[in-house]
A protein has these predicted regions:
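Metal-dependent nuclease catalytic cores that hydrolyze phosphodiester bonds in DNA/RNA
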Residues: 1-131, 136-154
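Broad hydrophobic/π-residue packing in well-ordered secondary structure
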Residues: 62-64, 101, 163, 170-172, ...
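Short, well-structured alpha-helical interface segments that form or flank functional binding sites
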Residues: 87, 91, 120, 162-169, ...
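Generic beta-strand structural signal
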Residues: 121-124, 128-130, 165-168, 177-180
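A short acidic, glycine-rich active-site loop
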Residues: 150-164
Length: 281
């Protein structure tokens, strides 16, 4: 049975009262939730290091972090968001264990070496000989990326968080295929398995990008922003305004990078606000 169908069948059976969750699974879930609280609230202050989970992000973003650039102001809700994400991962694992999914490894430390540099990371789970990453997703990301039949390609179009490099680095470290992502919709509770393609083309590209980023960061290559301003469209028409690129929107250093060139303003033609390059007309 396919992974997603196996998970969904267990959940349906549970709703009907036809399945149960073993006590050892319940205990492991509880321990993982405790670990999430310890990690998020008792962990040490994080300093910049080369990490498998982040090395696929835009190079300029990582350069800013390494150089100690001033990040965007933090919101208190971010701490709960991160904690919630860890607990969702624990919940998904408990459901898969109860569904008798063939889990071969969980939270396993791995490493990747290029040249004389080794970076480390922790893969989420190995199932049926494939490495998967568990992601908690917003309704928008779940609907428009993770749950689509072409979800992998959609993520590849604008992989602002380096998810693809992360997955292939983990799988390459174990000499196993990358299976894709097990995504949980934080708003609806839906689960989707977004499969990675069997072709090695994405793998070569992702690991190649990661290796280039590693070399650039180790060699202290001079900073250069990788993204230009973007022409704004409203109802498929050019407005004459410019916004920052999607990758810049998700970057924690956009104001340090763009400086006084950008302003956060309400869209004159809509209800939302966004980052503009110059005052919007």
């Amino acid at each position: 049975m396919e992974l997603q169908k196996q998970i969904e069948q267990y959940l349906l059976d549970s709703l009907e009262g036809d399945s149960s969750m073993d006590e050892d699974v319940v205990e492991r879930f509880g321990e993982r939730c405790k670990d999430a609280l310890r990690k998020q609230f008792n962990g040490k202050k994080r300093e910049f290091t080369l990490r498998m989970s982040a090395i696929g992000r835009p190079l300029c973003q990582q350069q800013m972090e390494k150089e100690g650039a001033k990040p965007e102001p933090l919101k208190p809700s971010l701490k709960l968001k991160f904690t919630y994400g860890d607990m969702i991962e624990a919940l998904v694992m408990a459901v898969m264990e109860a569904a008798k999914v063939n889990i071969e490894s969980f939270q396993e430390g791995v490493s990747h070496t290029t040249g004389s540099t080794t970076i480390k990371g922790t893969l989420d789970v190995i199932i049926d000989g494939k490495v998967y990453d568990i992601k908690s997703a917003s309704q928008h990301a779940f609907k428009n990326k993770f749950s689509r039949s072409d979800g992998f390609a959609k993520i590849a179009e604008d992989d602002a968080f380096g998810y693809i490099a992360q997955g292939y680095l983990y799988s390459s470290a174990k000499d196993l295929p990358f299976g894709g992502w097990i995504a949980y919709n934080k708003e609806t509770g839906d689960i989707a398995v977004c499969k990675a393609p069997a072709s090695d083309a994405y793998k070569r590209s992702a690991i190649g990008k990661a290796n280039k980023n590693i070399k650039a960061l180790v060699d202290d290559v001079p900073f250069k922003r990788q993204f230009e301003k973007v022409k704004e469209k409203f109802r498929n028409k050019i407005t004459g305004n410019y916004t920052i690129a999607l990758n810049c929107r998700y970057c924690n250093f956009k104001t340090s990078c763009w400086g006084n060139e950008i302003v956060f303003r309400k869209n004159p033609r809509g209800a939302s606000s966004k980052w503009y390059v110059g005052e919007p007309k």
